[in-house]
Amino acid sequence: MSTHARPLAVWLAQAPDAQLAALFEARGVRADVAWSDFFDAAEALLEPASIERALPRLPLTEAVALRRSVNGDDAGDDAGPLIALALLRPDGTPAPPVAEAVTARQDPTASETPPPEPSDESAAARAAERAFTTVAALADLVLLASDTPLALLTGGALASGEKRRIAATGTAPETLDDLAAIAVDAGLLAALDRRLVATESADSWLRESASARWTGLVQAFRAALPRGLRDGDGWLPTTAWAAQYPWSTAWPEQCSAIAERARLLGLIADDGSEPEWAVPLREGAPADPASLQRMLPTEVDRIFLQNDLTAIAPGPLQPALDVRLRRIAVRESAAQASSYRFTADSVAQALTSGETAASILDFLAEISLTGIPQPLEYLVTQTDQRHGLVRVFTDASGRTRVASVDATLLDAMGVDQALRPLALARDADGLTSRAGRDTVYWTLTDARYPAMIVGDDGRPLVVDRNPAPGHAPPAAPDYLPLIARLRERQGPDADAAWLDRELEAAVRSKAVLLVEIEMPDGTARELQLEASGLGGGRLRGRDRAADVERTLPVRSIRSARVIDPSAGSGATATGER
Protein backbone atom coordinates (compact mmCIF):
# COMPACT_ATOMS: atom_id res chain seq x y z
CA MET A 1 0.00 0.00 0.00
CA SER A 2 1.31 3.44 -0.91
CA THR A 3 1.60 6.19 1.68
CA HIS A 4 1.26 8.68 -1.20
CA ALA A 5 -2.41 7.78 -1.40
CA ARG A 6 -3.21 8.98 2.10
CA PRO A 7 -3.08 12.78 1.47
CA LEU A 8 -5.03 12.32 -1.73
CA ALA A 9 -7.66 10.21 0.05
CA VAL A 10 -8.11 12.96 2.66
CA TRP A 11 -8.46 15.59 -0.11
CA LEU A 12 -10.99 13.46 -1.98
CA ALA A 13 -13.07 12.99 1.16
CA GLN A 14 -13.24 16.77 1.65
CA ALA A 15 -14.03 17.61 -1.99
CA PRO A 16 -17.62 18.47 -3.02
CA ASP A 17 -19.58 15.89 -4.97
CA ALA A 18 -19.54 17.97 -8.17
CA GLN A 19 -15.76 18.26 -8.03
CA LEU A 20 -15.38 14.53 -7.49
CA ALA A 21 -17.68 13.76 -10.42
CA ALA A 22 -15.67 16.10 -12.67
CA LEU A 23 -12.41 14.49 -11.54
CA PHE A 24 -13.66 10.96 -12.13
CA GLU A 25 -14.96 11.86 -15.57
CA ALA A 26 -11.74 13.62 -16.56
CA ARG A 27 -9.67 10.64 -15.42
CA GLY A 28 -11.90 8.15 -17.23
CA VAL A 29 -13.17 6.37 -14.11
CA ARG A 30 -15.99 3.91 -14.70
CA ALA A 31 -19.15 4.69 -12.77
CA ASP A 32 -19.41 1.04 -11.64
CA VAL A 33 -15.83 0.77 -10.39
CA ALA A 34 -15.52 -1.45 -7.31
CA TRP A 35 -14.04 1.04 -4.86
CA SER A 36 -15.11 0.69 -1.25
CA ASP A 37 -13.69 3.92 0.21
CA PHE A 38 -11.64 7.01 -0.61
CA PHE A 39 -8.40 5.17 0.08
CA ASP A 40 -9.25 2.80 -2.76
CA ALA A 41 -10.01 5.79 -4.99
CA ALA A 42 -6.73 7.51 -4.11
CA GLU A 43 -4.66 4.41 -4.72
CA ALA A 44 -6.37 3.79 -8.06
CA LEU A 45 -5.81 7.38 -9.22
CA LEU A 46 -2.11 7.09 -8.35
CA GLU A 47 -1.58 3.81 -10.12
CA PRO A 48 0.96 4.14 -12.95
CA ALA A 49 -1.57 2.98 -15.54
CA SER A 50 -4.09 5.65 -14.47
CA ILE A 51 -1.44 8.37 -14.53
CA GLU A 52 -0.23 7.23 -17.97
CA ARG A 53 -3.78 7.59 -19.28
CA ALA A 54 -4.13 11.08 -17.80
CA LEU A 55 -0.88 12.67 -18.98
CA PRO A 56 -1.60 12.50 -22.75
CA ARG A 57 -4.81 14.49 -22.15
CA LEU A 58 -2.92 17.48 -20.76
CA PRO A 59 -2.63 20.49 -23.07
CA LEU A 60 0.76 22.10 -23.53
CA THR A 61 0.44 24.77 -20.82
CA GLU A 62 -0.56 22.24 -18.16
CA ALA A 63 2.12 19.77 -19.25
CA VAL A 64 4.75 22.51 -18.92
CA ALA A 65 3.39 23.51 -15.49
CA LEU A 66 3.41 19.90 -14.28
CA ARG A 67 6.99 19.49 -15.46
CA ARG A 68 7.98 22.66 -13.58
CA SER A 69 6.39 21.29 -10.43
CA VAL A 70 8.23 18.00 -10.81
CA ASN A 71 11.47 19.97 -11.12
CA GLY A 72 10.69 21.75 -7.85
CA ASP A 73 9.42 25.01 -9.30
CA ASP A 74 6.05 26.70 -8.95
CA ALA A 75 3.38 25.40 -11.34
CA GLY A 76 1.85 28.87 -11.58
CA ASP A 77 -1.72 29.52 -12.67
CA ASP A 78 -2.08 26.02 -14.11
CA ALA A 79 -1.69 24.39 -10.71
CA GLY A 80 -5.45 24.58 -10.14
CA PRO A 81 -6.47 22.38 -13.09
CA LEU A 82 -3.70 19.90 -12.22
CA ILE A 83 -4.86 19.69 -8.60
CA ALA A 84 -8.42 19.15 -9.84
CA LEU A 85 -7.10 16.23 -11.91
CA ALA A 86 -5.34 14.77 -8.83
CA LEU A 87 -1.97 15.14 -10.59
CA LEU A 88 -0.76 17.66 -8.01
CA ARG A 89 -1.38 17.77 -4.28
CA PRO A 90 -3.25 20.76 -2.82
CA ASP A 91 0.14 22.32 -1.95
CA GLY A 92 1.14 22.22 -5.63
CA THR A 93 3.66 19.37 -5.36
CA PRO A 94 3.37 16.07 -7.27
CA ALA A 95 3.09 12.68 -5.61
CA PRO A 96 6.10 10.44 -6.35
CA PRO A 97 4.19 8.21 -8.82
CA VAL A 98 3.24 11.31 -10.84
CA ALA A 99 6.79 12.65 -10.68
CA GLU A 100 8.18 9.35 -11.91
CA ALA A 101 5.77 9.24 -14.86
CA VAL A 102 6.49 12.85 -15.85
CA THR A 103 10.26 12.45 -15.52
CA ALA A 104 10.14 9.54 -17.94
CA ARG A 105 8.59 11.77 -20.63
CA GLN A 106 10.14 14.33 -22.92
CA ASP A 107 10.21 17.90 -21.65
CA PRO A 108 7.40 19.97 -23.23
CA THR A 109 8.28 23.45 -24.41
CA ALA A 110 5.95 26.38 -25.00
CA SER A 111 6.65 29.19 -27.43
CA GLU A 112 4.79 32.19 -28.79
CA THR A 113 3.18 31.62 -32.17
CA PRO A 114 2.28 34.61 -34.34
CA PRO A 115 -1.13 34.76 -36.03
CA PRO A 116 -1.30 33.20 -39.48
CA GLU A 117 -0.77 35.33 -42.56
CA PRO A 118 -3.97 36.79 -44.06
CA SER A 119 -5.10 35.14 -47.29
CA ASP A 120 -4.70 36.96 -50.57
CA GLU A 121 -7.66 37.33 -52.93
CA SER A 122 -6.94 34.12 -54.83
CA ALA A 123 -6.47 31.94 -51.73
CA ALA A 124 -9.57 33.45 -50.12
CA ALA A 125 -11.64 32.74 -53.23
CA ARG A 126 -10.60 29.09 -53.22
CA ALA A 127 -11.37 28.83 -49.49
CA ALA A 128 -14.82 30.38 -50.06
CA GLU A 129 -15.54 27.94 -52.88
CA ARG A 130 -14.54 25.04 -50.66
CA ALA A 131 -16.75 26.30 -47.83
CA PHE A 132 -19.70 26.56 -50.24
CA THR A 133 -19.04 23.03 -51.54
CA THR A 134 -18.77 21.69 -48.00
CA VAL A 135 -22.07 23.25 -46.91
CA ALA A 136 -23.82 21.77 -49.97
CA ALA A 137 -22.25 18.35 -49.40
CA LEU A 138 -23.32 18.41 -45.75
CA ALA A 139 -26.87 19.24 -46.80
CA ASP A 140 -26.82 16.18 -49.10
CA LEU A 141 -25.50 14.03 -46.26
CA VAL A 142 -28.17 15.26 -43.83
CA LEU A 143 -30.94 14.69 -46.38
CA LEU A 144 -29.74 11.15 -47.03
CA ALA A 145 -29.64 10.44 -43.29
CA SER A 146 -33.15 11.88 -42.94
CA ASP A 147 -34.48 9.39 -45.48
CA THR A 148 -32.44 6.38 -44.35
CA PRO A 149 -30.04 6.27 -41.37
CA LEU A 150 -26.42 5.73 -42.40
CA ALA A 151 -24.60 2.63 -41.16
CA LEU A 152 -21.49 3.11 -39.05
CA LEU A 153 -18.54 0.83 -38.38
CA THR A 154 -17.57 -0.10 -34.83
CA GLY A 155 -14.97 2.68 -34.75
CA GLY A 156 -17.58 5.29 -35.71
CA ALA A 157 -16.61 5.78 -39.37
CA LEU A 158 -19.15 5.46 -42.16
CA ALA A 159 -19.46 1.97 -43.65
CA SER A 160 -17.86 1.51 -47.07
CA GLY A 161 -21.23 0.76 -48.66
CA GLU A 162 -22.61 4.05 -47.40
CA LYS A 163 -19.59 5.90 -48.72
CA ARG A 164 -20.13 4.45 -52.19
CA ARG A 165 -23.80 5.41 -52.10
CA ILE A 166 -23.08 8.96 -50.94
CA ALA A 167 -20.21 9.38 -53.39
CA ALA A 168 -22.72 8.82 -56.19
CA THR A 169 -24.17 12.26 -55.31
CA GLY A 170 -20.84 13.86 -56.23
CA THR A 171 -19.21 14.13 -52.78
CA ALA A 172 -15.57 13.03 -52.57
CA PRO A 173 -15.56 9.81 -50.48
CA GLU A 174 -12.34 10.74 -48.67
CA THR A 175 -14.08 13.76 -47.09
CA LEU A 176 -17.17 11.91 -45.84
CA ASP A 177 -15.91 11.03 -42.36
CA ASP A 178 -14.83 14.63 -41.80
CA LEU A 179 -18.18 15.91 -43.06
CA ALA A 180 -20.00 13.53 -40.74
CA ALA A 181 -17.88 14.74 -37.79
CA ILE A 182 -18.71 18.37 -38.62
CA ALA A 183 -22.41 17.52 -38.78
CA VAL A 184 -22.30 15.67 -35.46
CA ASP A 185 -20.51 18.59 -33.77
CA ALA A 186 -23.21 20.91 -35.15
CA GLY A 187 -26.00 18.70 -33.80
CA LEU A 188 -27.35 17.91 -37.29
CA LEU A 189 -26.54 14.20 -37.10
CA ALA A 190 -26.32 11.87 -34.13
CA ALA A 191 -24.84 8.40 -33.77
CA LEU A 192 -27.39 5.95 -32.36
CA ASP A 193 -26.92 2.17 -32.29
CA ARG A 194 -24.18 2.30 -34.93
CA ARG A 195 -26.36 4.40 -37.21
CA LEU A 196 -26.04 8.05 -38.15
CA VAL A 197 -29.45 9.73 -38.02
CA ALA A 198 -30.65 13.28 -38.63
CA THR A 199 -31.72 15.24 -35.55
CA GLU A 200 -34.68 17.56 -34.99
CA SER A 201 -32.52 20.62 -35.66
CA ALA A 202 -31.45 19.33 -39.09
CA ASP A 203 -34.66 20.36 -40.84
CA SER A 204 -34.45 24.01 -39.79
CA TRP A 205 -30.74 24.13 -40.71
CA LEU A 206 -31.49 22.73 -44.17
CA ARG A 207 -33.91 25.58 -44.86
CA GLU A 208 -31.45 28.34 -43.99
CA SER A 209 -29.36 30.27 -46.52
CA ALA A 210 -25.87 29.07 -47.40
CA SER A 211 -24.22 31.76 -45.26
CA ALA A 212 -26.49 31.00 -42.28
CA ARG A 213 -25.76 27.28 -42.67
CA TRP A 214 -22.03 28.04 -42.68
CA THR A 215 -22.34 30.27 -39.61
CA GLY A 216 -23.99 27.49 -37.61
CA LEU A 217 -21.36 24.96 -38.68
CA VAL A 218 -18.28 27.05 -37.87
CA GLN A 219 -19.57 28.20 -34.49
CA ALA A 220 -20.32 24.59 -33.56
CA PHE A 221 -16.88 23.58 -34.85
CA ARG A 222 -15.28 26.16 -32.57
CA ALA A 223 -17.32 25.05 -29.56
CA ALA A 224 -16.23 21.43 -30.10
CA LEU A 225 -12.47 22.15 -30.26
CA PRO A 226 -10.34 20.43 -27.58
CA ARG A 227 -9.50 22.72 -24.70
CA GLY A 228 -5.83 22.68 -25.67
CA LEU A 229 -6.68 24.54 -28.88
CA ARG A 230 -8.90 27.11 -27.22
CA ASP A 231 -7.81 30.66 -26.46
CA GLY A 232 -10.59 32.19 -24.41
CA ASP A 233 -13.70 32.02 -26.56
CA GLY A 234 -11.62 31.66 -29.71
CA TRP A 235 -8.77 29.40 -30.78
CA LEU A 236 -5.00 29.47 -30.94
CA PRO A 237 -3.30 30.21 -34.27
CA THR A 238 -3.60 27.09 -36.39
CA THR A 239 0.17 26.96 -36.74
CA ALA A 240 0.37 26.19 -32.99
CA TRP A 241 -2.14 23.35 -32.98
CA ALA A 242 0.31 20.52 -33.63
CA ALA A 243 2.26 21.21 -30.40
CA GLN A 244 -0.69 21.45 -28.02
CA TYR A 245 -0.74 17.87 -26.68
CA PRO A 246 2.97 17.01 -26.35
CA TRP A 247 2.49 13.72 -24.49
CA SER A 248 -0.21 12.24 -26.72
CA THR A 249 0.87 9.83 -29.45
CA ALA A 250 -2.61 10.02 -30.97
CA TRP A 251 -2.63 13.81 -31.18
CA PRO A 252 -0.86 14.22 -34.56
CA GLU A 253 -3.60 12.24 -36.29
CA GLN A 254 -6.38 14.00 -34.35
CA CYS A 255 -4.85 17.41 -35.03
CA SER A 256 -4.60 16.63 -38.74
CA ALA A 257 -8.30 15.66 -38.82
CA ILE A 258 -9.35 18.87 -37.01
CA ALA A 259 -7.23 20.99 -39.34
CA GLU A 260 -8.80 19.27 -42.35
CA ARG A 261 -12.29 20.08 -41.06
CA ALA A 262 -11.24 23.70 -40.62
CA ARG A 263 -9.97 23.67 -44.22
CA LEU A 264 -13.23 22.16 -45.48
CA LEU A 265 -15.15 24.94 -43.72
CA GLY A 266 -12.98 27.57 -45.38
CA LEU A 267 -11.28 28.63 -42.13
CA ILE A 268 -7.83 27.74 -43.44
CA ALA A 269 -6.68 28.35 -47.02
CA ASP A 270 -4.65 25.80 -48.95
CA ASP A 271 -1.43 27.73 -48.32
CA GLY A 272 -2.07 27.86 -44.55
CA SER A 273 -3.13 31.50 -44.59
CA GLU A 274 -6.23 32.80 -42.84
CA PRO A 275 -9.25 34.16 -44.77
CA GLU A 276 -10.83 37.36 -43.51
CA TRP A 277 -13.98 35.64 -42.23
CA ALA A 278 -11.96 33.32 -39.96
CA VAL A 279 -10.44 36.15 -37.91
CA PRO A 280 -13.52 36.96 -35.73
CA LEU A 281 -13.96 33.28 -34.94
CA ARG A 282 -10.32 32.89 -33.91
CA GLU A 283 -10.59 35.96 -31.71
CA GLY A 284 -13.71 34.66 -29.95
CA ALA A 285 -16.29 36.91 -31.63
CA PRO A 286 -19.47 35.69 -33.35
CA ALA A 287 -19.08 34.54 -36.94
CA ASP A 288 -19.39 37.29 -39.55
CA PRO A 289 -20.11 35.75 -42.98
CA ALA A 290 -20.31 39.10 -44.82
CA SER A 291 -16.86 38.82 -46.43
CA LEU A 292 -17.55 35.18 -47.30
CA GLN A 293 -20.99 35.97 -48.70
CA ARG A 294 -19.44 38.34 -51.25
CA MET A 295 -17.52 35.43 -52.76
CA LEU A 296 -20.41 32.95 -52.87
CA PRO A 297 -22.57 32.53 -55.99
CA THR A 298 -25.95 34.25 -55.93
CA GLU A 299 -28.84 31.97 -54.98
CA VAL A 300 -31.87 31.81 -57.28
CA ASP A 301 -35.54 31.32 -56.45
CA ARG A 302 -36.88 30.24 -59.84
CA ILE A 303 -36.55 27.12 -61.99
CA PHE A 304 -37.36 26.00 -65.53
CA LEU A 305 -39.88 23.13 -65.77
CA GLN A 306 -39.59 21.10 -68.99
CA ASN A 307 -41.82 18.71 -70.92
CA ASP A 308 -39.49 15.77 -70.28
CA LEU A 309 -40.43 15.87 -66.56
CA THR A 310 -37.21 17.63 -65.53
CA ALA A 311 -36.49 20.90 -63.79
CA ILE A 312 -33.41 23.08 -64.23
CA ALA A 313 -32.23 25.61 -61.65
CA PRO A 314 -30.14 28.30 -63.41
CA GLY A 315 -27.99 28.72 -60.31
CA PRO A 316 -27.75 27.54 -56.69
CA LEU A 317 -31.37 27.20 -55.63
CA GLN A 318 -32.35 28.78 -52.35
CA PRO A 319 -31.98 26.05 -49.69
CA ALA A 320 -35.61 26.06 -48.55
CA LEU A 321 -36.79 25.66 -52.14
CA ASP A 322 -34.16 23.04 -52.88
CA VAL A 323 -35.14 20.95 -49.86
CA ARG A 324 -38.83 20.98 -50.77
CA LEU A 325 -38.17 20.31 -54.45
CA ARG A 326 -36.01 17.33 -53.55
CA ARG A 327 -38.93 15.89 -51.59
CA ILE A 328 -40.89 15.87 -54.86
CA ALA A 329 -38.22 15.17 -57.47
CA VAL A 330 -34.90 13.32 -57.71
CA ARG A 331 -31.88 15.57 -58.13
CA GLU A 332 -29.84 14.29 -61.07
CA SER A 333 -26.92 16.71 -61.02
CA ALA A 334 -25.55 19.29 -58.62
CA ALA A 335 -23.48 22.22 -59.82
CA GLN A 336 -23.98 25.93 -60.33
CA ALA A 337 -27.03 24.80 -62.36
CA SER A 338 -28.77 21.74 -60.88
CA SER A 339 -31.24 19.42 -62.57
CA TYR A 340 -34.12 17.46 -61.05
CA ARG A 341 -36.36 14.72 -62.45
CA PHE A 342 -39.98 14.02 -61.49
CA THR A 343 -41.05 10.38 -61.34
CA ALA A 344 -44.12 8.54 -60.13
CA ASP A 345 -42.12 7.24 -57.17
CA SER A 346 -40.78 10.67 -56.19
CA VAL A 347 -44.24 12.22 -56.35
CA ALA A 348 -45.69 9.30 -54.38
CA GLN A 349 -43.00 9.80 -51.74
CA ALA A 350 -43.99 13.46 -51.46
CA LEU A 351 -47.63 12.49 -51.02
CA THR A 352 -46.61 10.01 -48.33
CA SER A 353 -44.73 12.75 -46.47
CA GLY A 354 -47.84 14.97 -46.31
CA GLU A 355 -47.96 16.80 -49.66
CA THR A 356 -51.12 16.84 -51.79
CA ALA A 357 -51.54 17.23 -55.53
CA ALA A 358 -52.75 20.78 -54.99
CA SER A 359 -49.83 21.74 -52.73
CA ILE A 360 -47.31 20.27 -55.18
CA LEU A 361 -48.79 22.06 -58.19
CA ASP A 362 -49.11 25.34 -56.30
CA PHE A 363 -45.48 25.17 -55.20
CA LEU A 364 -44.22 24.39 -58.70
CA ALA A 365 -46.33 27.17 -60.24
CA GLU A 366 -44.89 29.64 -57.74
CA ILE A 367 -41.22 28.92 -58.56
CA SER A 368 -41.49 28.03 -62.26
CA LEU A 369 -40.41 30.47 -64.97
CA THR A 370 -42.11 28.36 -67.64
CA GLY A 371 -45.42 27.37 -66.05
CA ILE A 372 -46.31 23.73 -65.41
CA PRO A 373 -45.97 21.47 -68.48
CA GLN A 374 -48.96 19.24 -69.16
CA PRO A 375 -47.00 15.96 -68.76
CA LEU A 376 -45.89 17.02 -65.26
CA GLU A 377 -49.39 18.06 -64.23
CA TYR A 378 -50.73 14.76 -65.52
CA LEU A 379 -48.06 12.80 -63.58
CA VAL A 380 -48.94 14.57 -60.31
CA THR A 381 -52.70 14.20 -60.65
CA GLN A 382 -52.54 10.54 -61.73
CA THR A 383 -50.18 9.65 -58.91
CA ASP A 384 -52.42 11.46 -56.44
CA GLN A 385 -55.49 9.55 -57.67
CA ARG A 386 -53.73 6.25 -57.19
CA HIS A 387 -52.15 7.21 -53.88
CA GLY A 388 -54.12 5.91 -50.92
CA LEU A 389 -55.82 3.18 -52.91
CA VAL A 390 -54.62 0.85 -50.18
CA ARG A 391 -55.53 1.86 -46.63
CA VAL A 392 -53.71 0.47 -43.59
CA PHE A 393 -55.22 0.79 -40.11
CA THR A 394 -55.70 -0.99 -36.79
CA ASP A 395 -59.12 -2.51 -36.19
CA ALA A 396 -61.01 -2.86 -32.90
CA SER A 397 -59.36 -6.21 -32.14
CA GLY A 398 -55.89 -4.69 -32.37
CA ARG A 399 -54.94 -6.45 -35.60
CA THR A 400 -53.57 -4.57 -38.58
CA ARG A 401 -56.02 -4.42 -41.49
CA VAL A 402 -55.35 -3.66 -45.14
CA ALA A 403 -58.37 -2.50 -47.16
CA SER A 404 -58.92 -1.33 -50.75
CA VAL A 405 -61.76 -0.80 -53.19
CA ASP A 406 -59.66 -2.69 -55.75
CA ALA A 407 -60.19 -6.39 -55.06
CA THR A 408 -57.62 -7.33 -57.71
CA LEU A 409 -54.99 -5.33 -55.86
CA LEU A 410 -55.83 -7.12 -52.63
CA ASP A 411 -55.50 -10.47 -54.37
CA ALA A 412 -52.11 -9.44 -55.73
CA MET A 413 -50.87 -8.46 -52.29
CA GLY A 414 -52.10 -11.74 -50.84
CA VAL A 415 -49.83 -13.76 -53.14
CA ASP A 416 -46.90 -11.34 -53.40
CA GLN A 417 -43.77 -13.18 -52.22
CA ALA A 418 -42.20 -9.88 -51.11
CA LEU A 419 -44.99 -9.56 -48.52
CA ARG A 420 -44.73 -13.07 -47.08
CA PRO A 421 -43.15 -11.87 -43.80
CA LEU A 422 -46.38 -10.00 -43.08
CA ALA A 423 -48.41 -13.25 -43.19
CA LEU A 424 -51.37 -11.47 -44.80
CA ALA A 425 -54.68 -13.37 -44.43
CA ARG A 426 -57.65 -12.66 -46.71
CA ASP A 427 -61.18 -12.24 -45.41
CA ALA A 428 -64.35 -10.63 -46.69
CA ASP A 429 -63.22 -7.12 -45.74
CA GLY A 430 -59.65 -7.27 -47.02
CA LEU A 431 -56.37 -8.48 -45.54
CA THR A 432 -55.22 -8.79 -41.93
CA SER A 433 -51.80 -9.22 -40.34
CA ARG A 434 -50.37 -9.77 -36.91
CA ALA A 435 -47.52 -7.37 -37.74
CA GLY A 436 -47.72 -3.81 -36.49
CA ARG A 437 -49.50 -1.14 -38.50
CA ASP A 438 -46.36 0.85 -39.32
CA THR A 439 -44.46 -2.31 -40.30
CA VAL A 440 -47.22 -3.33 -42.70
CA TYR A 441 -47.44 0.17 -44.16
CA TRP A 442 -43.71 0.58 -44.84
CA THR A 443 -43.43 -2.94 -46.26
CA LEU A 444 -46.26 -2.19 -48.70
CA THR A 445 -44.70 1.17 -49.56
CA ASP A 446 -41.31 -0.44 -50.24
CA ALA A 447 -43.08 -2.92 -52.52
CA ARG A 448 -44.54 0.13 -54.37
CA TYR A 449 -48.16 -0.39 -53.42
CA PRO A 450 -50.14 2.91 -53.12
CA ALA A 451 -50.64 2.59 -49.37
CA MET A 452 -51.53 5.14 -46.72
CA ILE A 453 -52.13 4.93 -42.99
CA VAL A 454 -55.52 6.11 -41.76
CA GLY A 455 -56.56 6.84 -38.19
CA ASP A 456 -59.66 5.80 -36.30
CA ASP A 457 -61.57 8.65 -37.95
CA GLY A 458 -60.58 7.46 -41.43
CA ARG A 459 -58.34 10.47 -42.13
CA PRO A 460 -54.85 9.95 -43.57
CA LEU A 461 -51.96 10.07 -41.14
CA VAL A 462 -48.41 11.18 -41.93
CA VAL A 463 -45.89 8.81 -40.32
CA ASP A 464 -42.18 9.52 -40.15
CA ARG A 465 -40.25 6.37 -40.88
CA ASN A 466 -37.12 7.62 -39.15
CA PRO A 467 -38.20 10.09 -36.45
CA ALA A 468 -35.44 12.52 -35.67
CA PRO A 469 -34.00 12.41 -32.17
CA GLY A 470 -33.58 15.65 -30.30
CA HIS A 471 -30.05 16.99 -30.16
CA ALA A 472 -28.59 16.55 -26.70
CA PRO A 473 -24.99 16.28 -25.55
CA PRO A 474 -23.85 12.78 -24.58
CA ALA A 475 -24.98 11.95 -21.07
CA ALA A 476 -22.18 12.18 -18.52
CA PRO A 477 -21.56 9.09 -16.37
CA ASP A 478 -23.62 9.08 -13.20
CA TYR A 479 -21.07 9.07 -10.38
CA LEU A 480 -23.53 9.89 -7.61
CA PRO A 481 -24.03 6.25 -6.51
CA LEU A 482 -20.24 5.74 -6.43
CA ILE A 483 -19.66 8.94 -4.45
CA ALA A 484 -22.45 8.04 -2.02
CA ARG A 485 -20.87 4.63 -1.44
CA LEU A 486 -17.48 6.21 -0.78
CA ARG A 487 -18.99 8.67 1.70
CA GLU A 488 -20.80 5.89 3.55
CA ARG A 489 -17.42 4.35 4.32
CA GLN A 490 -15.93 7.70 5.34
CA GLY A 491 -15.34 7.60 9.09
CA PRO A 492 -14.82 10.61 11.36
CA ASP A 493 -11.18 9.67 12.07
CA ALA A 494 -9.12 9.49 8.86
CA ASP A 495 -5.96 8.52 10.78
CA ALA A 496 -7.67 5.54 12.37
CA ALA A 497 -9.15 4.45 9.07
CA TRP A 498 -5.76 4.68 7.40
CA LEU A 499 -4.11 2.66 10.21
CA ASP A 500 -6.75 -0.06 9.85
CA ARG A 501 -6.00 -0.32 6.14
CA GLU A 502 -2.25 -0.48 6.81
CA LEU A 503 -2.69 -3.26 9.32
CA GLU A 504 -4.98 -5.18 6.97
CA ALA A 505 -2.39 -4.87 4.19
CA ALA A 506 0.39 -6.02 6.52
CA VAL A 507 -1.63 -9.07 7.58
CA ARG A 508 -2.35 -9.99 3.97
CA SER A 509 1.35 -9.73 3.06
CA LYS A 510 2.55 -11.26 6.38
CA ALA A 511 4.94 -8.34 6.75
CA VAL A 512 7.03 -7.47 9.81
CA LEU A 513 5.81 -4.29 11.50
CA LEU A 514 7.46 -1.91 13.92
CA VAL A 515 4.44 -1.16 16.10
CA GLU A 516 4.38 1.67 18.63
CA ILE A 517 2.03 0.82 21.53
CA GLU A 518 0.58 3.25 24.05
CA MET A 519 0.89 1.62 27.50
CA PRO A 520 -1.71 2.10 30.28
CA ASP A 521 0.64 4.46 32.13
CA GLY A 522 0.86 6.74 29.07
CA THR A 523 4.33 5.63 28.00
CA ALA A 524 5.09 4.17 24.58
CA ARG A 525 6.71 0.86 23.67
CA GLU A 526 7.87 -0.48 20.32
CA LEU A 527 7.46 -4.08 19.19
CA GLN A 528 8.61 -5.93 16.09
CA LEU A 529 5.59 -7.97 15.14
CA GLU A 530 5.06 -10.48 12.32
CA ALA A 531 1.42 -9.66 11.55
CA SER A 532 -0.74 -12.76 11.26
CA GLY A 533 -4.32 -11.68 11.91
CA LEU A 534 -6.68 -8.75 12.45
CA GLY A 535 -10.18 -8.93 13.85
CA GLY A 536 -12.41 -7.85 16.68
CA GLY A 537 -10.39 -4.65 17.06
CA ARG A 538 -7.19 -6.62 17.80
CA LEU A 539 -3.95 -7.25 15.89
CA ARG A 540 -2.32 -10.66 16.27
CA GLY A 541 1.29 -11.53 15.49
CA ARG A 542 4.56 -13.02 16.70
CA ASP A 543 6.83 -10.79 18.76
CA ARG A 544 10.26 -11.32 17.20
CA ALA A 545 12.22 -10.18 20.25
CA ALA A 546 10.38 -12.37 22.78
CA ASP A 547 9.41 -15.08 20.26
CA VAL A 548 5.84 -15.21 21.59
CA GLU A 549 2.41 -14.62 20.06
CA ARG A 550 0.85 -11.32 21.05
CA THR A 551 -2.62 -9.81 20.65
CA LEU A 552 -2.70 -6.01 20.70
CA PRO A 553 -5.78 -3.74 20.89
CA VAL A 554 -5.81 -1.62 17.73
CA ARG A 555 -6.94 1.40 19.71
CA SER A 556 -3.62 1.25 21.62
CA ILE A 557 -1.49 1.30 18.47
CA ARG A 558 -0.06 4.76 17.82
CA SER A 559 1.70 3.87 14.58
CA ALA A 560 2.78 0.89 12.50
CA ARG A 561 5.60 0.80 9.97
CA VAL A 562 6.72 -2.03 7.73
CA ILE A 563 10.38 -2.79 8.42
CA ASP A 564 10.74 -6.09 6.55
CA PRO A 565 8.67 -6.01 3.39
CA SER A 566 10.61 -9.00 2.05
CA ALA A 567 8.89 -11.12 4.64
CA GLY A 568 5.66 -10.85 2.68
CA SER A 569 4.45 -9.22 -0.54
CA GLY A 570 6.63 -6.13 -0.27
CA ALA A 571 4.36 -3.63 1.49
CA THR A 572 6.29 -0.46 2.36
CA ALA A 573 3.60 1.91 3.64
CA THR A 574 3.35 3.40 7.09
CA GLY A 575 0.38 4.27 9.22
CA GLU A 576 -0.18 6.49 12.23
CA ARG A 577 -3.07 7.15 14.51
For the regions a protein language model found, what residue spans apply to each?
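Primarily hydrophobic membrane-targeting regions of prokaryotic envelope proteins
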Residues: A22-E25, A63-R68, A79-L87, R164-A167, ...
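Helix N-cap / beta->alpha transition motif
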Residues: P94-R105, L158-A159, T199, P275, ...
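Short, amphipathic alpha-helical interface elements at domain boundaries
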Residues: M1-W247
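Short, exposed beta-strand "edge-strand" segments with a Pro/Gly-rich flavor and a Y/T-containing core
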Residues: A9-Q14, P90-P94, R194-A198, A335-F342, ...
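Extended alpha-helical interface modules used as scaffolds for assembling large macromolecular complexes
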Residues: W214-L529, G533-R538, A545-V548, S559-R577
